[in-house]
């Protein structure tokens, strides 16, 4: 299957959809399991990690196997005991590397694949849960795959987790302890790219109406998480969708699609303004929270414009796939796979390589704000103890 994108020039952009995926069948999640793994896992990890837990929401940029399992060559560079995986990459993804920056081994496990074994790993120090689902979007009708789980549903899953945690924590002062745990945890959100892909492919409204609708829905999700106890938000903005191989392959000379990138930049600015108002206006429900917006757009455009300085040699072509720029046919078991994956920006027609995720996470986490990769603070400052007081958080 392919999505057809009409542009305002003699070109047609074909965005291949995912192939060869299967739905995860292990959905045995019990109230006790969730309560124990989140509460205890976070507490045991607090001594060595920068936050007690990480809760991940979004799309394939941070999905670690919520609803699909991808066959090789996806995950080709992961340890053998890590397979199968739902990461849309040759290896680890952004959620993994941000979690590592926080002191964890990898991203927390996916909500619908928790087992007694994975809960044991969490009890040993990996706190939190991933609700992120590949192919999902901010809008409820943005579902690239039948198994994709919208951001709204992901937030509902967290609400269920919170309820189960509350039921488990019935002791004296348990409510305050739970509030403290959630306030000190990181809520990581990386979503919106698929919404833009579908809008570019088949716009059913003007760009401005689409952006306002997207922002309204995103704001609702942030507010719901805040109402459920989230106080520390790490937002990863929408990447430059106009520069992915699937778009470039149908644009003359393999260039980026300027209009697509323009409306993404505008939306990212809108999100930054919304978060600023949400966190500082005393009349807004989010007063008292702290946040950082990481610009995946600026990070990837920096890699694209100055690849050599960032360790890349190929920034237009997909590492795995066939046809022009490796993007006319999706990555599958018999596809051509590049050998130098560490120097490729893109893994397949629309997703980054492990190398891109690792370098991008390091920049979002550590780069000075003056370099315009994060605002108003970077992720390291977001989880710094000195941010607890300014954001209304208690120290761990």
Where in this protein do the model-derived segments appear?
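Intrinsically disordered, low-complexity basic segments at termini and long loops, enriched
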Residues: 1-17
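Conserved active-site regions of diverse hydrolases
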Residues: 13-396
